[in-house]
Regions:
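N-terminal Rossmann-like NAD(P)+-binding domain of SDR-like oxidoreductases, especially those catalyzing
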Residues: 1-195
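Residues at structural and domain junctions
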Residues: 27-30, 75, 82, 93, ...
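Glycine-rich loops and low-complexity Gly/Arg-rich segments
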Residues: 52-56, 78-80, 102-104, 150-154, ...
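Pocket-edge positions in alpha/beta enzyme catalytic cores
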Residues: 57, 69, 96, 146, ...
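Short-chain dehydrogenase/reductase
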Residues: 97, 101, 152-160, 202, ...
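Glycine-rich, flexible loop segments associated with nucleotide phosphate handling
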Residues: 120-126, 179-184, 206-212, 240-245, ...
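Catalytic core of nucleotidyl cyclases, primarily class III adenylyl/guanylyl cyclases
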Residues: 198-200
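C-terminal substrate-binding subdomain of Rossmann-fold SDR/epimerase-dehydratase oxidoreductases
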Residues: 212-350
């Protein structure tokens, strides 16, 4: 059974590719490599022992997407493609609205077209890569799926708008009168971290990392002088931001569980994917120091626009609906992230 992964060469997409292949699916990667590296494909082939099927192009190109869908006839689509940096979205909101919202509209139109004309035999089935940023700045934690939604950045706003589009599809049942009802799984990620245990693939930002873990490991490996800790006066135990860090392989397993649930039970859902445990920035730094045996220098800096004090999940609904839960610890995330970074000091660039 083919599964199309938009943005499948990216950090989460590449790990999900492995999990899907191990689960017996045939994942097909769709990517334009704007935020990823072609060498990932070679690494995936080494890990899985099989060649990787790639469709190179842009998710904004609707006619091309239609042709890809007709050719591969996937039983499901996992939509990762998009821009993902909170800070950048504040500085350049139109980029995020165009790429993220426009890309989602393009994909939905393409899926609707191939199902409406009978080119695809299955119900349109989509797993969407959403984000905990749709909860804005929550007043209490842990966060449940029925908490009020909001946003503190254009990135979060783009995810919220896409969720609303998908909700409308679920309520109306179709994009057009001729297309069948949709099966949609919305996965609200918390903070992905770690890497594949092989050390062959991991998180490799094209520029200065926006996520904490790759920044810390780049400092530990000597690529950067120190970690900027944005905010030391949050109302948290040590004054730094608290997040729910989830191992990327646990997150990948969540996508497999989501697809199986949609295909087997024909029921749409929205769930959190997190560990349910909040960890502060300083706690992550200390964990990486223990794992790597290196000192990680840091400096406090002003809070970043769009950041919130604390954000961690109640993931009990995912366990109930999908039979999924996060299994790996913070120490395992740090160990795998360090293995990747130390083996690949310059990431995929050699």
């Amino acid at each position: 059974m083919n599964i199309l992964l938009t943005g499948g060469a990216g950090y989460i997409g590449s790990h999900t590719f492995i999990a899907l292949r191990e689960a017996g699916f045939e994942p097909v990667i769709l990517d334009n490599f704007a935020n990823s590296h072609p060498v990932v494909l070679e690494r995936l082939a080494r890990i899985t022992g099989q060649p990787v099927t790639l469709e190179r192009g842009d998710v904004l190109d609707t006619p091309w997407l239609e042709a890809v869908l007709r050719h591969h006839q996937p039983v499901g689509v996992v939509h990762f493609a998009g821009d993902k940096a909170v800070g950048e979205s504040v500085a350049n909101p139109l980029k995020y609205f165009h790429h993220n919202i426009g890309g989602a509209v393009s994909l939905l139109r393409a899926m609707a077209a191939v199902h409406a004309d009978g080119s695809a035999p299955q119900q349109p089935t989509l797993v969407f890569s959403s984000s905990a940023t749709v909860y804005g700045d929550p007043t209490t934690v842990p966060i449940l799926e029925d908490f009020p939604r909001s946003h503190t950045s254009p990135y979060g706003h783009s995810k919220l708008v896409i969720e609303d589009m998908l909700s409308a599809l679920r309520q109306t049942g179709a994009v057009s009168p001729a297309s069948p009802a949709w099966r949609i799984g919305v996965l609200r990620y918390f903070n992905p971290a770690g890497a594949h245990e092989s050390g062959l693939i991991g998180e490799d930002p094209a520029d200065i990392p926006n996520n904490l873990m790759p920044y810390v490991t780049q400092v530990a490996v000597g690529q950067r002088p120190h970690v900027n800790v944005f905010g030391s006066d949050y109302p948290t135990p040590d004054g730094t931001g608290v997040r729910d860090f989830i191992h990327v392989q646990d997150l990948a397993a969540g996508h497999v569980a989501a697809l199986r649930t949609l295909l087997d039970h024909n029921k749409s859902f929205t769930v959190n994917l997190g560990t349910g445990r909040g960890v502060s920035v300083l706690e992550v730094l200390r964990a990486v120091e223990r794992t790597s045996g290196r000192t990680v220098p840091f400096k406090f800096a002003p809070r970043r626009a769009g950041d919130v004090a604390q954000c961690y999940a109640d993931a009990s609904l995912a366990k109930h609906l999908l039979g999924w839960e996060a299994l790996r610890s913070l120490e395992e995330m740090c160990a795998d992230a360090w293995r990747w970074q130390s083996a690949n000091p310059n990431g995929y660039r050699g």
